[in-house]
Amino acid sequence: MTAPSLVVHSEPQCLTLRDAIATPFELVAPADAPEQAPRHASFKAYTRGCLYDSDGARVDLSVRVGGVGGDQAASLDPAILPPEQRGGSWLTGRALYLGPCMNHYGHFITEGLSRYWKQDIGPVDHVVGYPFMHNNGNIQIEAFHRHLASLLDVPIDRMAILRSQTVFDEIVVPEQLWATNVHVNAHMRTVYERIRARHAGRKSSGRLFLSRAASKRLGNPLAVEEAFASFGFRVIHPERVPIAEQLALYANCEVLASLSGSGMHNCLFARPGLMTIEVGDTRARRNPVLTQRMAHELAQVEAHFIPFGEGTEADIEPKIVRKNLRKILSELPRRGPVLMLRLKRRFGGLGGGKAQKRG
């Protein structure tokens, strides 16, 4: 039986509002919202803060609803803003609304970028957005935010954070095209293609395996790295590689593999039809999580998954990884690249570097 599609094909919406009201951002602990139905164990916070039109009606296009599946946050914004709560500091001119700003890389390249699709907005005087639950509601703009936003002509460094009630002379509100654990709009392919096109066409970056030095959900990433190295994969720790170099690697690779999580989301920047290989962990034991399945379908990649298994330990069996790779790649492992990897670790060389030659 074919699973329902996670990609929708509706025409994206974009509203232009006059005299709209932005309520201030607020984090609400689950214990402080007892009227809400119980959530799953990893749920962290409710949020308040969205736009209302001049009549006090909530602008649903401005809301990150959340709370679906394993999502860790959900909105508490009421449908109507009472008359006595309307008003606020007036912001003259034209503003662009970006919704919640995601500090976390994986959230930013999925739902965060999904309000950056509108290309014909015209000049704006202000860029505004909300914080999110990460880092206790504080915004941390990093190099990857700046680079990706600049490729899409969005001046993120000008973004003002909505922490006090504000009334807008005029505000443009693009729809959020990625609804976490619900669906993603096919128009997002255009966003990722615009990014990929700026980095594609260079020399092949070969087979890539994206890893990390430590993981709460996988106890033996070094052993997994060696399994992939034995099949000719370059082991890369993305946090050590500048974002522009990362995007060039993803746009020009032959196979993209990763531990489960944000690294695997980078398939969105790769070419359609690319083979991807994900290694499961204690969260994604049998299948990719829903966000990753959305990314796979949107990116139109040939996705493979190595199950973690049902054991109580946090380690995955390296022999299981190698067995799966033999089956997926139809080839045998080699010892030489593993020895090279160990030397690179010793001398701190797990950044971008040069592609390995296949022998």
Which residues make up each language-model segment?
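The feature primarily captures lumenal catalytic ectodomains
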Residues: M1-G359
